[in-house]
Amino acid sequence: MPFRFVLQNQWPTLAWLAQGNKSDRTVTVHHGAGVEVTSDWFCEAVWDGDFQSGDFDQTDIVAGSGGRIRDGRITFVASGSTVDRIQWFEDADSIYVANSICCLMAFTGAVVDPTYASFISDANSVIEGLDRYKPSVQTSRGEINLVYFNNLIWDEMGCRVEPKPGLGRDFSLFEKYRAFMQQSMATVMTNIGDNARRFSLKAMGTLSSGYDSTTIAVLAQQYGLEEAITFHRARGGEDDSGASAAKILGLRMHNIDRDAWRQRVCPEAPFIASYSSGEDIIFLGADRHLHGKVLLTGYHGDKVWDKLTTYLSDKIVRGDPSGLALTEYRLHPGFINCAVPFWGTRQIRDIHAISNSQVMKPWDVPGNYSRPICRRIAEEAGLPRESFGMKKKAVTVAGWDVFHEGGNFLTPSSQEDFLEWIGQHRAAWLKHGRLPPIPSIKVNFLVNGFFMLSSEIKRWIASKTPLWHVLGDPSYRQHYLNLYLFPWALDRMKRCYAR
């Protein structure tokens, strides 16, 4: 079951697709220029172990993806988080596994139904947990299967998903949890900087005025973190810079304009084509700083470290899908999204017990924005109490509707291209006996208003909630044309995977 590697120089640098031949058990791995390859493993990944050993299949502390031959089987490894994934497809002759849904569909010739209106809810279902998300995307060639957090095994029995190892750690005390985080950070940082890598990597922090990124920067600075990016303005324009913490920690800061992406041509496509909400598009403004980086992010810290969280399932239930929109985009500039709060997250009940223990009271601040574990780690490293975590802010754009944030449906170039695409696919709706959407922003505004009002009145009748509460709830404002953004973005990004 040997690997055969085929370099695809024109592909995004970190993209890969493995095609396994069922008859002779050979596996051909097509890959971009930045993927590490050896005789029995390949990866674009970092993990808590020796790089040359390639044991990323034997840990849950891993970011990125790859494949490993061991004991007569192949383990395809997904990131130990739900801000990334691998996907696979099977036909009569082969299995196909890739770290890009765009790559997989381009390679196999699969297409999605452009008239399907539930991509938004299907994609967001991952926040409900590993046992409740919709595990596949229907295409013209059959189902493409999605694997979050866990690993995919291929052997003589076929393909199956296998849980990652890593449960049963002792998090009975704050000191033990902190020691675990420190040891994990130390080994991951060593792995990042290993000289045996053909393509060198370097850690890059993300700093804001909040808890999560500050905690991660404190942990990583002890083991060589030198720089970080910050978006100096949060959603709504509030100051959210992490400059104060960066100065104390001695980190070099790169200030990023949160709206810089709006100046690009068709910037939204790679983020929406990730099969996600698209809300992490703000990172496009930092692209010149991201090549060859391992981005240490705080995704899921709002649940793992929050004192008041009720999300205590070992199946990794989240509050939002933030971070997932980087899945496709990151392959192009070539960086790895390392979401540190996911380390040990399946034992969130133990972590939550620490946050609420009596011994953590000195680091528990009044109000509903208290993360005692974060505060203790940061304050004991020398950060003043008032320098971080004083007010909860958000820097990402707010989900599939965020492109309305600046008053536009999409940026002008993307809007023009998307409406043209809608017009080109009119026949798909007619084939289903349905009227196609009219490619007009004005009509979209009117139709959206009608559907929003009618659906919210129905909800009001069913819930007996005061009508003004229903009409004021932004979570129910579905935008009509937004329902079809994913197949448009997918079409555009598949062009990056020509052979």
Residue map of PLM features:
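C-terminal catalytic/acceptor-binding lobe
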Residues: F409-V447
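Proline-rich intrinsically disordered, low-complexity coils
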Residues: P2, P12, P114, P135, ...
